[in-house]
Amino acid sequence: MNALFVANKPAGISSNHFLSRLKRKYGVKKAGFSGTLDPFASGCLIVALGNHTRLFNYIDKTPKIYEATMWLGATSASLDNENIEEITLCPPLNLADVKAALGELKGEIAYVPPKFSAKHVDGKRAYELARAGEEFELKNQTMSVFDVNLTAYMHPFLSFRISVSEGSYVRSYAQNLAAKLGVKATLSALKRVSEGKFVYENERFLNPLDYISLPRNEYLRDPADVMLGKKLSVEKLKFGAEGLYLINFDEFFSIIEIKDETVTYKLNKVEKC
């Protein structure tokens, strides 16, 4: 079975554990997801079954939109509602100050990834080192914040909706916001609403071609040449400029790259749903 769809991951379970459930549900051995959701987080998880797992590098997943809630006065080593270390009282915030801080934290934002994350450190995952109590530092990175708005504030809980680039950590954004407001805080809830055009629709199977924005090309000879993976020449394509292209056939599609007047297959014979 080949399929591409959006699942709704519940809070309290890892993305890998949730994927195992889906594999049993659909009776498949090969499956994958794009964009890990932390165990405490819920929402949109792009899932592919079978050979469609090869598509993750080519589908459009930006911007990513989240709904997040901060717990003011709480601190956590993992920057979420797990591993809570301390809870202190803090005075209510001025709404104007909160909105001003959010307004300043737009555009390209520098941040430090959470130590409880899947980042690699000397060949190991950062969360493995953090759980083992080892000392290490992660390098500053940048995220693109396209938009962010306050959605609710009932002290000590402050909620916002944020649109960010792929690979961003909303937990780290919340730490930047807390620092700007002069308080300690951690995320108590996080929901991913969408990734690009991907939204949850009861696991409806999707047409991958609707989510790949590569320019289209045409093979001007016998489609069987592509089906058999034969070597292609630029002269046999409608467009010969360098770049990545999608070639669509009746039963399948392929992704090719033209570089230095040479055509190479990036993906071939991807069956349609």
Q: Predicted regions span which residues?
A:
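Pseudouridine synthase
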Residues: R125, A130, P156-K197
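Short aromatic-glycine motifs in intrinsically disordered, low-complexity regions
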Residues: A130-K139
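Helix-hairpin-helix/helix-loop-helix acidic hairpins
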Residues: T142-L158
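Short, charged/polar surface micro-motifs in flexible loops or helix N-caps
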Residues: G50-T53, A74-T75
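Long, charge-dense, solvent-exposed interaction surfaces that engage phosphate-rich ligands
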Residues: G107-L129
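Accessory RNA 3′-end/elbow-binding domains used by RNA modification enzymes
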Residues: M1-G12, N16-F33, L37, A41-C44, ...
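Phosphate-centric recognition/catalysis
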Residues: V47
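Acidic, low-complexity central loop/insert segments
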Residues: Y58-P113
